[in-house]
Amino acid sequence: FFQTNFAFAAVRVMPTLIELNANKSRGNYLTTAFSVQADKGETIRFKLYPEYFTITDSGKMSSAPSSNNADNLIPYARFVPNEFTLKDGKPQLVRVTFTDIKKLPDGESRMVMFIEDVKAKEVLLPSGNKNVSTKLIVKTRLGIPIYVDRGRFVKVGRFDDLQIQKENHNLVYKMSLSAGGNSKVRYHGKAQIIKDKKLIKEFEMNSNTIRANGVFEERGILPQNLEEGEYIMKVILTYKNEKGESKNLIKEAQFSVTNSI
C-alpha cells in the first residue's frame, strides 16, 4: 500500500504501514508516529492530509475522499505538524493521535495519510524539434495506510481454491482466497513444486491484503524448464488472527508437464 507517484526526489517513510489495536489503549485515545526523510542536498516542503480508503478485490487501496462510512478514521485523527520542510537529510517526525476511540465501531477502521510536496517541479524534456519544448510537472506523493482495530474484531482467512491451467505454452496457477470477520487479513507465504515426494523448486508468493468479508484472486506463471512428469504445487500462506497468532492456509494442486509445455 505504500505508493509513490513518480517521485522526483528519494523520500523515505518509516514505518510504511501502521496497525493499531484500540483494545490495548488505557484511555480514550491512541497515539502513533512516523518519520519522513529526504536525501541530503534536497530541500522539500511537504503538506499532510488524510483520506479514507477501501481495499479492492485485487488487494489495492482505493481512495474515497468524501466518505461518511462509520469505519472512517479521519473524524478522530489529529496530526502534528500538518506542513514541514525536509532539509539536509534530517528526518521529520509526524505524530498522529486518535481521540474518542470508544466511538469507533467494532472491527477495522482506516485512513491513509498522504504526504505531498507543496511546490511542483518542472522538468524540460528533450524534443526532436528545437522550436518545441515539452514540460513535465512532477510532484511527490506518499501514502501511509493507518488501521485501527477495536472492540470485537475477527480476522479469518480462507484458501478457497487453487487451479493450474495451460495458457499459451505456460502453466498458470490461479489462487482464490477470502477473509471472514470484520477486519482485513494480510498474508505472505511460499509455493513448492514437488515431484515424487521430492522438493524440486520453491519460490516466494506475493504478500497481499484481503479486505474484511472480501475475496482475492491471484494468478501467476509456474517455473519453466521442468522435466516431463507429474507434479504437485503446494502453497503455504501465513496470516495473523485477531489474537496475533500465526495461522497457516495450505492448498495443493496436481499438474503434468509434457513436451508441449
Residue ranges and their predicted role:
Residues 84-92, 207-216, 225, 242-245:
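Short proline/glycine- and polar residue-rich coil/turn motifs
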Residues 47-54, 99-147, 226-261:
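Terminal connector regions
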Residues 1-7:
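C-terminal segment of classical bacterial N-terminal signal peptides
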Residues 41-44, 181-186:
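A short beta-turn/strand-edge loop motif at beta-sheet boundaries
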Residues 9-42, 83, 157-170:
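Beta-sheet-dominated interaction scaffolds and their linkers
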Residues 12-14, 42-96, 195-200:
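Surface-exposed binding patches on compact interaction domains or structured appendages
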Residues 33-37, 97, 172-180, 221:
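Short edge beta-strand/loop segments characteristic of extracellular beta-sandwich folds
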Residues 31-35, 78-116:
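Ligand-binding face of N-terminal immunoglobulin V-set domains in extracellular IgSF glycoproteins
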